[in-house]
A protein has these predicted regions:
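Extended, folded cores of ATP/NTP-driven motor/assembly subunits in large transport
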Residues: 1-312
Length: 312
């Protein structure tokens, strides 16, 4: 299960979910080709109905999602920096193979790439150029930049930013920013914004929120001994507060809830579970400011209906 993987996963990890409008043009082209080759007029009518259905759904509802797991290099304390790059590559490759093995055991399909460097460059380009990347692939952008620098006689000094950075970035507004012609707003779920009890699969609400809604989960594993010590101290402090507080006081329920939560975490650690901090970042994108405001309001309503709070 995923719990077994979390026991041996890196200390810091990011799970990124990117949702964007699905490209159904290739599928529609195949249907049109089938209509042209079909001899039976009745079958042509059925194929045409199917074509219109796919086109109608694609314009409104078709969304494609990509799931990424991101690892950060964790240098070993006291290690030499002489071979730091080599050590980082080895550590990250081991983390990737381990994650791939455990995810496949859980029934997930993990996409493999012949050239990992090219794949990562394309992903970074897509994330920074959400709009341009749908029209100009990374290979075309890279070729154009190389050709430009060669023409200028400076082919050996091409910065990495020339291949990845968007042509337009505007951070002049507090409520949103504009990158590559798209409007972005960023929100988070504060520590008090989660439900106290959730069912399995509660994150599907965020993952399936719709086009233009990205979710980032940042996980950080804490040393078990450190957390056990902090929990024990905080439980003792809260129990002392309870003795000094009347059960009719409004603070009594909050303190009682904190004590019970502390014991819940303590029992989990005693049963060989690990303690993780999790931060949830939600990114909303749109083609216009009006559409961004509408998506933001709808997302806040959706979260509120599930007792979740969204903060900028």
């Amino acid at each position: 299960s995923y719990m077994f993987y979390l026991k041996i996963s890196p200390v810091r990890m990011q799970i990124k979910v990117v949702s964007k409008k699905a490209d159904i043009s290739n599928h529609l082209d195949k249907i049109q080709e089938a209509i042209r080759r079909e001899q039976d007029e009745r079958c042509k009518v059925l194929l045409m109905d199917y074509y219109n259905l796919i086109r109608r759904i694609g314009l409104k509802e078709a969304v494609t999602r990509r799931f990424f797991i991101v690892f950060a290099y964790e240098p070993i304390p006291g290690s030499s920096k002489k071979n730091e790059e080599k050590d980082a590559v080895n550590q990250l490759e081991i983390a990737e193979r381990t994650a791939r093995t455990y995810l496949m055991q859980c029934g997930n399909n993990v996409v493999e790439h012949e050239n990992p460097d090219s794949f990562m460059a394309e992903v970074l380009y897509m994330l920074l150029n959400r709009k341009t990347s749908t029209e100009t692939p990374f290979s075309a952008r890279a070729a154009a930049e190389v050709e430009k620098y060669i023409a200028e006689g400076d082919a050996n000094a091409i910065p990495i930013s020339a291949f990845l950075l968007p042509e337009q970035m505007d951070f002049g507004k507090a409520a949103y920013c504009r990158i590559d012609g798209l409007y972005y707003s960023y929100f988070m779920i504060p520590s008090t914004g989660y439900k106290t009890q959730v069912t399995a699969g509660w994150l599907s609400l965020l993952v399936n929120a719709g086009e233009g809604i990205d979710v980032d989960l940042f996980l950080s594993k804490e040393p078990k001994e450190k957390i056990q010590f902090q929990l024990g101290r905080q439980i003792r402090i809260n129990r002392s507060k309870m003795k000094e507080t009347s059960d009719t006081n409004t603070d009594f329920d909050d303190i009682d809830s904190a004590v019970r939560a502390g014991y819940y975490l303590k029992d989990g650690l005693a049963n060989n579970q690990d303690f993780y901090y999790i931060n949830t970042l939600i990114t909303i994108t749109a083609d216009s400011r009006e559409e961004l405001e509408w998506r933001t309001n709808e997302m806040k309503k959706l979260m509120l209906s599930q007792d979740l709070i969204l903060k900028p």
